[in-house]
């Protein structure tokens, strides 16, 4: 009794408790914490502290100790701060494969060679070495068994075929340049179209051949040409003349000639417009010798390397590939 009397002398606040098992009443019962009837065995081992902090971001901290299965307060609650942001770590950039590096080096080596016409002997040797390395790592060793990869338009980027050099040479084609040489393949109909686009001062035109191909081996196809097509000229933008031109070290003012050149240009434009309305000219190719074969030594979704007669090599890049950009 002496210990209980001393306990009653400790100053404390009154704790209000609402019993969940009692019948509902309009009056809330209160019990002093100093009462001996209140301190049960379970409550004597419980310590509960609730703290409230003043913070720009309010938080509530609850802590429970001596937790057991009968503890109605549950386990310790972690501190929760509102407005948290989840941080996702970015993956490091993927390292390019050896094939991708070789293709990039090849594309860089082809730049400025005019499809092989202007390539020096040193550049040619470098290109041949890169082609050989790519051929040894061909991801599709049986290209004719992956015909869907052949589909689409392929732009000629380089060739060692000397038969195309006169066509590529500007000296043999005054005032005309070769704008594009391409090959379009349709594996469903087994057709191939080779096309050369020429660009002049006022118009562009094209010459193309249509052919059928047959699969002869996992790498080789036989091509037979059937017809040729000469496209009608398509009018381009007007010629923009400079104020002066340099000739033999002297600047010559060409402004007095602009009127004459403009009248000639207008006349030529009217002629080109009348021709452009005409259908293209088609002619059959009946020569039995109009055949060739191609051996595809490298193929992926953006690069194709075939070899032709006499060991000539061609490098073609799929239209839209980043390899076409310098």
Curated annotation (Swiss-Prot):
It is found in: Plastid, Chloroplast thylakoid membrane. Induction: By light. Levels increase upon illumination and stay high in daylight, dropping back to basal levels in darkness. Keywords: Chloroplast, Membrane, Plastid, Thylakoid, Transit peptide. It comes from the Eukaryota. InterPro entries: PAP, PAP/fibrillin_dom. The keyword Membrane applies. GO terms for biological process: cellular response to light stimulus. Pfam families: PAP_fibrillin. Residues 1-63 form a transit peptide. Expressed at high levels in leaves and in the petals and anthers of flowers. Belongs to the LIPC family. Associates with the major light-harvesting antenna complex polypeptides of the PSII oxygen-evolving complex. This is Light-induced protein, chloroplastic. It comes from Solanum demissum (Wild potato).
């Amino acid at each position: 009794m002496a210990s209980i009397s001393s306990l009653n002398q400790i100053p404390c606040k009154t704790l209000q408790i609402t019993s969940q098992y009692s019948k509902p009443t309009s009056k809330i019962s209160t019990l002093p914490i100093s009462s001996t009837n209140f301190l049960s065995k379970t409550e004597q081992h419980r310590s509960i502290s609730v703290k409230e902090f003043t913070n720009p971001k309010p938080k509530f901290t609850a802590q429970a100790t001596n937790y057991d299965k009968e503890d109605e307060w549950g386990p310790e609650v972690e501190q929760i701060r509102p407005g948290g942001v989840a941080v996702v770590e970015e993956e490091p950039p993927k390292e390019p494969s050896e094939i991708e590096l070789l293709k990039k080096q090849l594309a860089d080596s082809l730049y400025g060679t005019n499809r092989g016409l202007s390539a020096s002997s040193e550049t040619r040797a470098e290109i041949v070495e890169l082609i050989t390395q790519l051929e040894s790592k061909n991801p599709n060793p049986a290209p004719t068994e992956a015909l869907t990869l052949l589909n689409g338009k392929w732009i000629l980027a380089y060739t060692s075929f000397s038969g195309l050099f006169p066509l590529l040479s500007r000296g043999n084609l005054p005032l005309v340049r070769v704008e594009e040489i391409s090959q379009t393949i349709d594996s469903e109909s087994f057709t191939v179209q080779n096309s050369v686009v020429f660009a002049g001062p006022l118009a562009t035109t094209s010459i193309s051949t249509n052919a059928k191909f047959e699969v002869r081996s996992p790498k080789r196809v036989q091509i037979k040409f059937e017809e040729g097509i000469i496209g009608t000229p398509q009018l381009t933008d007007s010629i923009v003349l400079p104020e002066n031109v340099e000739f033999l070290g002297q600047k010559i003012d060409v402004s007095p000639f602009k009127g004459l050149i403009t009248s000639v240009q207008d006349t030529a434009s009217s002629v080109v417009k009348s021709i452009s309305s005409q259908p293209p000219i088609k002619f059959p190719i009946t020569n039995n010798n109009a055949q060739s074969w191609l051996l595809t030594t490298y193929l992926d979704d953006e690069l194709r390397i075939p070899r032709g007669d006499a060991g000539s090599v061609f490098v073609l890049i799929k239209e839209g590939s980043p390899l076409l950009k310098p």
